A protein has these predicted regions:
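Acidic, two-metal ion nucleic-acid-processing modules in DNA metabolism proteins
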Residues: 1-15, 19-186
Length: 186
């Protein structure tokens, strides 16, 4: 980011940055802030080397692993790798062909869900999803027909999806259990 900022440094009184963030103070060059911003935006876009492909989000999976392989012990062992963050992301696993069979909205605002899924081998587990449940419902509607997303929370379903997930330990009323946290789906 810093390298590209140097290409338009004439627009700044000061600037700095690194791979994940940048900061700058815009120099006054024209009569109005709008003119300064527009000139800066124009030149920045002319120097931009991003392609459409660069704008496609990428998901990096650590291990394709069936949910039936996951254990509480594995989740506990993974916690030894903490602290997780930008330079040390929490491990991400994936499984294809899970069947979402039931969903339950949760939270005071009903904005996250607990989805029951069945593996190809017939094992059923629950996955918590803290992502946008409306987007997930829209995805199901596009893939399986209008109304599919809404039906997930009202009746039993059978929607094959592939997911990425993380493992954690859920502690509730003093009891610990393995928890699957769904991150991405397709």
């Amino acid at each position: 980011m810093y390298e590209h900022m140097t290409e338009v440094k004439q627009y700044f009184t000061k600037f700095g940055g690194h791979k994940l963030a940048a900061g700058m103070s815009l120099a006054k060059r024209y009569d109005s802030l709008e003119e300064d911003v527009e000139a800066f935006r124009k030149e920045l876009n002319e120097c931009c080397t991003l392609t459409e492909d660069d704008l496609i989000p990428r998901v990096h999976i650590d291990v394709p692993m069936p949910v039936s392989y996951a254990t509480k012990k594995l989740a506990e062992d993974l916690n030894l790798l903490e602290p997780f963050g930008v330079g040390n992301p929490k491990p991400l696993f994936a499984q294809k062909d899970l069947h979402v069979i039931r969903g339950f909205k949760m939270g005071a605002k009903q904005n996250f869900a607990r989805n029951k899924v069945r593996t190809p081998e017939g094992t059923e587990v629950e996955m918590v999803f803290f992502g946008n449940i409306d987007h997930f419902a829209d995805f199901l509607d596009r893939k399986y027909g209008i109304g599919s997303g809404a039906s997930l929370y009202t009746t039993y379903c059978d929607f094959p999806v592939s997911v990425t997930y993380q493992l954690s330990i859920n502690t509730y009323r003093g009891n610990e259990s393995l928890q699957f946290i769904m991150q991405n789906y397709c």
